[in-house]
């Protein structure tokens, strides 16, 4: 059984884009990233009274999301708020649910969702999240719903052709179509780079960097909760550390967080963690590392030092957290099996060359024999089967 992650809504229908809700969510997320749930007690502001409850959940084992041991309690709800947590035997309610010693917890937060368009084209599909106990969905990882270029195509939504450029417009569409979960977005710096610079391996001029910063500012004003990167994928792979600091510093003015799929998760893992920490330190924001791992068996020993780097940053006063997925597989686009240098002229230009047999032979040889880059063929066992 799951209670809403903000411990105040029970209908699960509101998108959390308005300032008070965002501020509360930011505070809760920052405090509880490592467990990806929000404290049931710490984020509830509803006061109990002696009146009847609308709903009373009894005989529950409560896991509050704050790292505490579970405890037995009853939960009283009035309207869309949790009114009381404790021993409520004998209290009246319009509806009583016997939890029968099951666990009751705050709703889980999906820390890295990637269904930006699906939420609009098929809102009921979000029910699959609810059935897993997920009540808040954080979307991003370099790519994001906004900003979009005026040249980006419209999206087919329930019979309508809709386009948007900003998060403000995107959130309006979410509210118009309605979704059954809370939705939170960061601004993907891949998106920002693509709108201003395209897909090529180029560095921004001073004027272009200011344009990129303005896009981040607009996204934060519209309700984004931070910036995100996916630094193994073009064109994000071409961004310098300094560029990422400058853009994330803008998000820091709004209490934002830096979320990152780091530049390397294998032989250069430690350098990638150092870069993530440097970006957070330079921008003055908390850092959250997506799916921390040491890919490739030869790199497994690096994990101890990786955790030591994070612990050291935390001991020094930085807010650095990470998540790990509980399986040994990896999902990645086939384009990531090729060296990023091949995309320097843009993805479309590279794809036009793939019909050349000589290039295809060169690509295969490079994948099978080199390792001075994050070569995922090497990490997964060097076997095409």
Question: How should each PLM-predicted stretch be described?
Answer:
Residues 13-32:
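Bacterial N-terminal signal peptides that target proteins for export
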Residues 48-54, 62-107, 123:
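Histidine-rich, glycine-flanked metal-binding segment
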Residues 60, 80, 101, 112, ...:
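Divalent metal-coordination and catalytic microenvironments
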Residues 91, 96-169:
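Metal-associated gating/positioning segment near the N- to mid-region
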Residues 147, 229-239:
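Glycine-rich, proline-tolerant flexible connector loops at the mouths of alpha/beta enzymes
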Residues 174, 179-180, 185-206, 210-233, ...:
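Active-site neighborhoods of metal-dependent hydrolases
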Residues 242-253, 257-286:
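Extended hydrophobic/aromatic segments used for targeting, binding, or gating
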